[in-house]
Design a protein with these regions (language model features):
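P-loop NTPase motor domains
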Residues: 4-305
């Protein structure tokens, strides 16, 4: 006798069909229509851009959704998708309210999520090299937090300009590269000198502790690991996406009727890493939001690809 536990909820569904059988027209479109009518947030990805063209306007104008289109096929025409949006938001709250520990904790949490997703997206075990990757996560978290805290948006003539945000992943790369340079003190690089200037209780100093106590060669290896992971983001086209604030972050996605359309060109394999990183980061941030609401998101969300 066999006993099977069957989950009959309509949570996951996989449709397989040859080209032209109607996977998009007869399956995805009705599901997106149902999702919009039900008021659920959704993330949709495709390689042609048909979903965004045909249903982005419908979702916004007919159902009142906030819509974001991340177009990796034509990045210069895409909405922004700054990976540091939530980190920057909560650091800005901390700057206005220095005693707000909850906001600082959230900034640190989202910085750790981003660092883990960039350094070790697949959750691999690197055996004897595990130390370098763990230390690299700590260094990347520390640099991200410092950037969010001490590099506020640029003001022009006293006014804060929306598109002058300087806190993004490319700035993180530039800062790590500059801090890797040797300092005037022998045996120390600029990163170690910067950490020495921070108060003892500053969390950035704690996150980078394993790297700071390492030998000079090990420290250089850790910093090189961070740089090698960040090299992927150095692309003039992709910077048009990564260097501008997201119109929708994970918290607003979970709280309001929102739709994110991701267009991924199948002929350009170099964009796959960034697409996967966006999905992983959004998923982990949504898990974190759900943890704050008894394991459930305030607004039900779906992923349609």
């Amino acid at each position: 006798r066999l006993t099977a536990l069957v989950d009959c909820d309509d949570i996951h569904c996989l449709m397989i069909g040859a080209s032209g059988v109607g996977k998009t027209a007869y399956f995805l479109y009705p599901n997106i229509e149902y999702t919009c009518a039900s008021g659920m947030s959704f993330f949709a990805s495709d390689t042609k851009g048909d979903l965004a063209r045909n249903y982005g306007t419908i979702a916004r104008d007919c159902y009142g959704y906030q819509v974001s289109v991340v177009d990796l096929r034509n990045p210069t025409k895409s909405d922004g998708y700054n990976l540091l949006t939530l980190i920057n938001h909560y650091m800005d709250v901390c700057r206005r309210e220095p005693t707000n520990l909850a906001a600082r904790a959230k900034a640190e949490k989202y910085a750790k999520i981003l660092s883990k997703t960039i350094i070790n997206p697949d959750g691999e075990n690197f055996a004897q090299n595990q130390y370098f990757y763990d230390a690299a996560e700590g260094v990347l978290t520390a640099v991200t937090l410092l950037l969010a805290e001490y590099l506020p948006p640029k003001r022009i003539h006293g006014e804060l300009r929306e598109r002058r945000e300087r806190r993004h992943i490319v700035s993180v790369f530039k800062l790590v590269q500059e801090l890797l340079a040797p300092s005037i003190l022998p045996g120390k690089n600029e990163f170690q000198l910067l950490m020495d200037r921070l108060p003892e209780e500053h969390k950035a100093k704690w996150f980078s502790g394993s790297a700071l106590t390492a030998a000079e060669q090990s420290m250089a290896s850790v910093m090189s690991t961070v740089l090698s992971r960040l090299n992927t983001f150095l692309d003039s086209e992709l910077e048009q996406v990564l260097c501008f604030d997201s119109t929708i972050d994970a918290e607003s996605f979970a709280a309001k009727k929102s739709s994110i359309f991701q267009i991924l060109p199948e002929e350009d394999q170099t964009k796959n890493f960034l697409a996967g990183l966006m999905i992983q980061t959004l998923s982990r941030e949504l898990f974190s939001v759900a943890d704050e609401h008894d394991g459930k998101l305030p607004c039900r969300a779906m992923s349609l690809s």
